[in-house]
Amino acid sequence: GVREDTYPDVVXTA
C-alpha cells in the first residue's frame, strides 16, 4: 500500500 514492501495495491510506486 505504501512502498515496494506493500506494493500489491499501488504496484508501481517504487
Curated annotation (Swiss-Prot):
Keywords per UniProt: Cell wall, Secreted
Name of the protein in question: 43 kDa cell wall protein
Predominant location: secreted
Gene Ontology CC annotations of this record: extracellular region
Subcellular location: Secreted, Cell wall
